[in-house]
Structures are given as C-alpha cells and as structure tokens.
Amino acid sequence: MIKNRVIFISILFLISAQNKLPAQNRSEKKIIEFGWDYPNVSFLKANITNMEKAPFDGVVFSFDFDIYNAFDTTQRPDFQFQYKDLSEIQWKKFTDNFLFVRGASISGAHWLDDNSWVKIVQNLKKVSKVLAVSKAEGIGFDPEYYYPDSTLNPWIYRASWYNNLSYQEVGRYVKKRGKQFIQALQTNKPDIKILCFWLLGLIEMQSQSQPVSETGMALYPFFVEGMLEGQNKLSEIIDGNEFSYGYQNPIGFIEAGNYRRENGSKFIKESLQPKFKKVSLAQAIFFDLIYAKSPEYEKGFDKQTKERWLRDNLYSAFKTTDKYVWFYNERINWWKGEVDSGVAKIITDVKNTINAQQNNRSNQINGNSLLLNFKENKPDNYQGFYYSYTKNTNALRIKLLDKDIISIQVYNNSRLIYNLTDPSVNFSIDLNKKYNKKGNLIILAKSSNGKSTVAYVN
C-alpha cells in the first residue's frame, strides 16, 4: 500500500518537548483512546479520576450490557441506556468522548422492513439522548462485520437475500436507512460527530480486485449517501482513515485527506460528491502494529526504533488531522496500568511539542527541511527547501535548495489548498484566499528523482 520513498521533515519537529504551555493554550487537536480495553459506563463512573491521568483527551466507551449494535431491534428498557449514571460522570480532562456503536445487528440490518426500522429508530433516538446526557461528542462507528454468519452482514449484496431486487434497488432502501440513522441520532444531539473508523476506504480497497456490488462492503456507500442527505448543518461525519494504522512515513498522513475524498467520492452519486468532499479526516495510531504486540506485526525493530516510529507517527497524525487522532490498541490495557514503559511519556511529549508550535506567537516562522527517518538515529544533512511564513500578511515564501523539485503542494491540516508544478527556485504564495490562519500548514515537495520533501510549518 505504501511506496518506499525517501522522506524529509521540517526541522521544527525537533523543538524540545520541554516547551510546556498552560492549559488554556492547548491545541485544538485531540487524541482519543480506543481499544479492546474500552470501558463501560459503570467503570467510567467509578474510575474517571484515575483514567484521566492517561495522556488522552477522551475515550470510546460502551454501555454495560454490550457494545451497541446500530441496527438492533431489541426494545430495551430505559435503565439499560444508563442515563442517570452517564449524567453523573465527572468529566474534566476527557473533553471529547464517543459511544462505541457497531454497524451491525444479531438479526441483520432489516433494510427492506419498515416495521423493524421503526424500532431501530426508536432505539437510536435513545442513543441520541445518551449522547446529550453524557455530554459525549458523538459515536465511534465501526462498520466492519466480525461475526461468522455472513448472511447477517448488512453490507453484502446477494439478490437472493433481497427478493431478487437489483443492487441499485436494494441500495435505495439502504440509503433511506442511512438518512433515518443520522436523523435519529441528531434528535437530541444536533451537533453529533460520527467518527467512522472506516468511511469508504475499505470498499475502495476491496473494489480494486472485484466489482463493487460483490465486495464485502457493497451496500455501505448507499448508507453513507443517506447520512450525507440527512446530515444537518451542525453534525459532522468524520473519516477515521484506518489506513493510517501502518504508515511508515509522513507522506501517507499528508496525502490521506485528499486521497480519501477524491477516491471515496467515486462511490457517491454526483450530486452528493461536493458534500462528501467536506467530510473531515481523523488519523489513527495502531499501537500493537508499531510495537509488534503480535508476531504477525514483527519487523525486527529494536525498542528505540519502535519508540521513534510511534513518536513520528503521532507527530504527523496530529499535524495532518482536522481534529482527532484515535489511538487504537488491543493487547495493552490503559485502565489496568498494563502499558509498555515510556509510551505515556512519548504521547505527552508529542502533545507538548504540538501545543508549543500551535501557540508560537512569533510573527515569522522559518525553517529548512531535513531528512528524518524513524529507522535512523539522526537526521541526514539533506535539505530540500527553505521556507518563511509571515503571519500578519499570511504570506509563504519558499526557496528550493534541491533544483530537482518539480512540484509543491500546500496543505491546511488534511486539505490540499495549493498545488504548483515546475515551481521557480524562489517564489511566494499569498495564502489569504485559502488559509484562515487556523490549523496546521504543511508543505510537500516532490522531485524528479523520487524524493519527497516535507515541512510542517506550524
């Protein structure tokens, strides 16, 4: 999935993590913990003070009875939604929390059954009340199907399962349900955030080897279309970009937003593509992969190299996300203290560096790009370009140090805002039309010899 390229990162990465800032100057970027150690409501209520000692800004949690299945028709009594317990949780440091919801049901999604969807919508309205009562930001939505009975997979299309209706005919039902889904969730939480761990990246990957209608996520694009149609002006759909689990360089993080939106829009009808391209992007860190917590993840890296990989990925994830980084783990448990030594400090140090850079009050920021590869102990002397950014005029000046550079791209968080080919050795960009001085500025240069040069400006 990821090409082997030589990568260059801005020297600003090397700013000391000792630049700690008071709480009021924290970055708007947030890191959310999610994993097999997800807490239930009762655990949260009893342990929130200790939990908030972990280096996160929020957590993905579940009800006591189980992970909530989005298409569940079970008519549960109100007490199972734990409104009272949720209202009594004393959140302080954890400001951005999400209820774990799976895109599944033990009896299927009932796409064609209006009566079942009356029950599903009633339940989702209760979930919406849960979000309002708990002051959670929204749901962490996992559309992957994990169960052995494939006939209950809501996203697979087989004509024989749907009264021999065509793919498009079933899709119209699924689209209707996606609209009902988000509208029900907006009932009590109009500003809900739906963090989709996968949006359309998974079907994008599956469709490379087979027709879309035959993939394991065949019906999911219709559901996403429905969400887009039912979305109000306050709610937000977030692409969790699970692809970022395995990135080994910053290019994947930088290009992900543009790539996900452009390629994902191919699965969305034309009239909804502009709205789809407004979807925000999150970035993921898969701790178990980086630290090789299972044999299949082993790459032969020593402890120091794994630590550099984690640090570099966290840094790039923070710089390129629109708001959220989700830290996923399976074989550690933050809430029982079963975490590798030094990991919490790495997260804290990266957050402090991000905060210091985000709150840099200097009017002018200058830097050179240099080689920084987590597999190496120290940066190379290579310099791709020099840049100077002036805040009050919102002007970016670039001088190429590598004459083989053939393209320059400028990003604001996950969004590509400028794309220049065959740039001059010295040039300036007036950013006023496309950059409102919020979020991070990133410069990506590519050369004719295959090198990619990166600078994180702020």
Where do the model's predicted regions map?
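Bacterial Sec-dependent N-terminal signal peptides
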Residues: 1-24
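Glycan-processing catalytic domains of CAZymes
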Residues: 24-367
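Short, compositionally biased P/S/T/A/G/V-rich stretches that sit at domain boundaries
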Residues: 362-391
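Short beta-strand segments within Ig-like beta-sandwich modules, predominantly Fibronectin type-III
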Residues: 418-424
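Short strand-edge motifs at loop-to-beta-strand transitions and within beta-strands
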Residues: 425-429
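Surface-exposed, short loops/turns at beta-strand junctions within beta-sandwich domains
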Residues: 431-438
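Conserved structural position at the C-terminal beta-strand
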Residues: 445-447
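Edge beta-strands of extracellular beta-sandwich domains
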Residues: 451-458
